[in-house]
Amino acid sequence: MRYVLSVVSKTEGNFNWQEAWGHLVVSPEAAAAQVRSGDLVSTSLPEPTAFLNALANRTDLEDVTVFVPAPRKGGAAIAQNKKLELRAPFLTQILREANAHAEVVPVRLEDWGRFSVRNPPRVACVQVGTPLPDGTVPPGSAIAGNDALVRRARRDNDLVFGLVNPVVPYIHGDSFHVKDFDALIHVPLKGSMPIFDQRSSPSDLDPFIGALDDLIPDGATVQSGVGGLTEVALSRLTHKKDLGIHTEVMCQGLMDLMKSGAATNRLKTVFPNKTVFTIALPETFDFLDDNADCHIVPAHVALNHQTIADNREMRCVNLSLIHI
């Protein structure tokens, strides 16, 4: 199946989504109140923290399993409630610091959608951006496997909530619609919680940068993993020409390549003229906001092996551990 990028124009002005879609607006507590004993609850990347906190405050539940892809404060709160079982593919620093326990689910990011279809939750909650006047709901800073939670075939009594984060950018690409949700959760947020743990800046990069310079030719398509080493190293390749970007995570280093003109996406064979990703880090938000050169897509598109292989001169830069 071919995936086609859709373009939705952002509408400026004083549009109030809570007034326009008032019949759908609920509080985190009201949404969490819909969870029943015995339910499987699945959430998004990034986590819908306010919903998870409200759910963690419930003491009347039994045998409830909560899937949180990358637990932050909300996931840690779930783990502290003995009536709830936290499941996650990643055990984050916040969980470790809270001495919280979770069952590890060995599922790759590109398989989260299929995992949700095979393990359908009765209640799903995904973080989204601010709804637009035409009913379009931008995905916010990530889609990852969130699309499957929203668009999967539902059984009777299944519920899907969208927690609206007003501080994430409007990113072009895939999107939802208000009709996809049973309710939209309103919570005044002061800032966007990071998706990943803090990355440290590496030192002594010269050997690594020299190797990358030789391995990444002009016109190559680049993918970068999360990590201070790869991000900083890529940002030093601004002398390159006509690079393309097809990646899992849009990070500082890739953004710097676009800002410098080194990455133009002009020669890309898949999604030409577009930077494509499924997760955006906070340091890229201002750059991505209403930037038509950048498109967000589901993980099963960004990480599809055949799609990656079809890209021109694909180069993937990721960290690895060597045990000596």
Locations of regions flagged by a protein language model:
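Conserved alpha/beta enzyme-core scaffold
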Residues: 2-321
